[in-house]
Amino acid sequence: MNQWMELANRVLAGAEVTDEEALSILHCPDEDILLLMHGAFHIRKHFYGKKVKLNMIMNAKSGLCPENCGYCSQSAISKAPIESYRMVNKETLLEGAKRAHDLNIGTYCIVASGRGPSNREVDQVVDAVQEIKETYGLKVCACLGLLKPEQAKRLKDAGVDRYNHNLNTSQRNHSNITTSHTYDDRVNTVEIAKESGLSPCSGAIIGIKETKQDVIDIAKSLKALDADSIPVNFLHAIDGTPLEGVNELNPLYCLKVLALFRFINPSKEIRISGGREVNLRSLQPLGLYAANSIFVGDYLTTAGQEETEDHKMLSDLGFEVESVEEMKASLSAKS
């Protein structure tokens, strides 16, 4: 039995991954990558079998953000030529939900740019979500920025299932990425979501000039935060942002990162998120031996892979999509 399968068995028995073991994952020799992914899949299969959860993003409000996040094309300091618009109307949100439902995508993510939502924007989301739940029964995730307790309660009462607010990077590296809000601001929003009964979703961006120790620290911080769903983004450097031209990643390292997140957060939904197409490239299928969830379609301001290609990839792997009906049943079981 190789060292990664031994570690996987210890993790399944309840052991915590040490920093030394975590570093060994990130330093795994490239020629041993299949052994590492086999260990990660041993854990993934224990909790999720061969099921894959599908998610779709609706960019409900674009640009116009006062924050100074260095990776983001929508920030106040970005010069990227993106489309900017205020919160879309209810009909547009419903059209997106119908598309997700028709494509058998179980989770619909409503994402809005900005520091945090106004009460009016919360009103708009609440109004749409109530009809989305009645008509399509999708799992709804909201990602609206820094959240107040009363706003979180309104979202929960309307039927929102999950709230996303990424920590993005380690506490140590956070001020290198943005200074317009703190790491603790982000943690606080996730805690507010949890306290309101929303399922917490929080993840990371890899490739933003962090160290390997930063990657380990963010994976462990998300474990401590007990995030149910962990999106792992890989930087897609956009021209006009401070991180323009940064390209520190390669496909094999991205696989090691996904394996690390699975070993540290064994039972959680690990989602391959933004940047998978440009960073994992032809090795995208291997990522699903560690992760059990992907975004389908376009991201916020960058294009994703065609939905049909994602379905072909999953079929070729012998994996099974968690259907909308299966997702509905799992939500009913939790309620």
UniProtKB/Swiss-Prot annotation:
Record note on cofactor: Binds 1 [4Fe-4S] cluster. The cluster is coordinated with 3 cysteines and an exchangeable S-adenosyl-L-methionine.
Catalytic activity: (4R,5S)-dethiobiotin + (sulfur carrier)-SH + 2 reduced [2Fe-2S]-[ferredoxin] + 2 S-adenosyl-L-methionine = (sulfur carrier)-H + biotin + 2 5'-deoxyadenosine + 2 L-methionine + 2 oxidized [2Fe-2S]-[ferredoxin]
Pathway: Cofactor biosynthesis; biotin biosynthesis; biotin from 7,8-diaminononanoate: step 2/2
Domain of life: Bacteria
Top-level EC class: transferase
Task performed by this protein: Catalyzes the conversion of dethiobiotin (DTB) to biotin by the insertion of a sulfur atom into dethiobiotin via a radical-based mechanism.
Entry's family note: Belongs to the radical SAM superfamily. Biotin synthase family.
Protein name stated in the entry: Biotin synthase
